[in-house]
Amino acid sequence: MPTPRLAFALLTGACWLSAAAAPAQTPARPLEPVSFAQVQIEDGFWKPRLDQVSRVTIPVCIAQTEVKTPRIRNFEKAARRQGETHEGIYYDDSDVYKALEAMAYSLKNRPDPALERKADEWIDKIAAAQEPDGYLNTYYTLTGLDKRWTDMEKHEDYCAGHLIEAAVAYYNTTGKRKLLDVAVRFADHIDSTFRRQNRPWVSGHQEIELALMKLYHVTNNDRYAKLADWFLDQRGRGHGKGMIWNNPDMGPKYCQDEVPVKGQREITGHAVRAMYLYTGAADVAAVTGDHGYVQAMKSVWEDVVNRNMYITGGIGSSGRNEGFSVDYDLPNEQAYCETCASVGMVFWSQRMNLLTGEGKYVDVLERSLYNGALDGLSLSGDRFFYGNPLASSGQHARSEWFGTACCPSNISRLVESLGDYVYAKSADALWVNLFVGSTTTIPLKGGKVQLTQQTRYPWEGTVQITVAPERTMPFSLRVRIPGWAQNQPVPGTIYRFADASPEAPTLLVNGKPVAATPRNGYAVVDRTWKKGDVVSLNLPMPVRRVAAADSVQANQNRVALQRGPLVYCVEHADNGGKAMNVIVPDGVGFTPAYRADLLGGVVALQAETPVVTISADGASVTTVPKKITAIPYYAWANRGKGQMQVWLPRKAGEVKVSAE
């Protein structure tokens, strides 16, 4: 299907530096992130969610962490050093740290003295549990320090990574160094134990690599960047030892240890481990300019997106390994799609955008954010999904908490740090990646520039960007034009729109058309800007039918519905208690309408289409026309258990129904 031409053309004066051309030891990425701390979210869709995470979700995480489960109690025991018993799972420390990180972001967005006091209380307990040599892990302190660093699967470095991330976030928000000093001492212990002695170590659950790069940036100590690079280089060299490597159902593929990182070209194993690994590798490449990492990351990312990603941006189809199986194995009702994996896909895709300046990475980031990740958090803010299937016969429900509780604090920290993903910058250009009502002030080499976005996205495709440089000055403004607005739902060919849309995006500056075309997924406006200039972007949002490639057997003769960045589903609560009996023949048109009374306010889709029923005795099948309603996928399972499906049959033979 041909792509509609955009109503603007690219200005030829703009350019970007290719990461592939950057020499080693030269910063590789053309873009730098704009921190969430520089972005004030004033968005009708996201601001209530940030507030709810602060008011509801983080208090839930606190209560579960220190009252309903023994996580904080383990730190208290470790500090007493009286030989008490460890309670819970050996990686539980990480949930404390992720909750602290979410608290740090929340304090920046919504200052709360009581929350800050609680964070300081936890930090005191964490610091008291640290060993004199810098080691910090309550499981081994309480079960025997003689066994530390003996099983690479036991998440010691994973927990350390989340400690470091929390420490950096809390320091950046409050300026308080106590937790950062704890993290530095632990990182120094790890560096002295492994890299400086060249003692082999392969992380069984990657995370420390990306965390060390954050520590490097906040301390400006290249010791931590070298350690991150060293950990990456340990993989694929036969060093792995412990439960993962001894288990024939796992093995080195499970934790991406079969091939050295720079030689990896295909996605394997546990999805969250992979996302954290590749995020860390991209972070290292951004500093060192290591072309080997850049090429590996590009290839593996394309393998994920082209052959192993759900239309929701969810990844990791198999519950057996919480990860990837074989190409195009994307079942719907059995889909695993861990919330943390979608969160990790947001992290990694952002880093790839910064490395390359290509908008396709933000297209996938946006898809994962609005669909696969956001689905993990209930509309009430106090219930969660661990896995995110694309169909349900009624067996799926959100949970208050989990034994392995990585997802609640992970989605919390992502939502609270949303501002990290909205903008980026280069020396003389500003990049608008996400359409979120917000204000930011960004320094360029010619001076500071304030940008203000106003929009009702994702419900409407109109975005107004007001530009206010501190003085009249030339620079380039690059506004992402999403692939879904150009007849490409995702990069590659795994999904395509099954219908045509003649509507094209338009871009105006001060009410006048701009002669520009997209470049690398962006519309480039290169001009001398003055205070009060207004950029108006219109992204048409027709309801689109998505078809999957023939290789995805689960979705043959089915279509999914998408409007803007949102994937839709049909759920029992809107459709007479059923969702599996719907047929969407070719040519059926859906009408969008905003419903303030539905699911906190959503654009719902409606159409009259056939539904199938089977008589009680199973002797007859009836097809009758009925008005059906589809809702955004992220909003399902907020009204009790029941049927749901994303991929809707085009023919009666594909319908799954039960006798009435």
Regions found by a protein language model. Give the residues of each.
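Bacterial N-terminal signal peptides
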Residues: 7-18
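Bacterial Sec-dependent signal peptides at the C-terminal "C-region" and cleavage site
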Residues: 17-27
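Aromatic (Trp/Tyr) and acidic
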Residues: 25-113, 117, 147-173, 206-223, ...
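Carboxylate/His-rich catalytic cores and anion/metal-binding grooves
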Residues: 115-135, 226-233, 292-309
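Asp-box/WD-like beta-propeller blade repeats and closely related beta-sheet repeat scaffolds
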Residues: 141-157, 164-167, 177-203, 209
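C-terminal beta-rich recognition modules with glycine/proline-rich loops and embedded aromatic residues
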Residues: 228, 297, 363-371, 376-466, ...
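Flexible glycine/proline-rich, aromatic-decorated loop/lid segments
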Residues: 249-254, 308-327
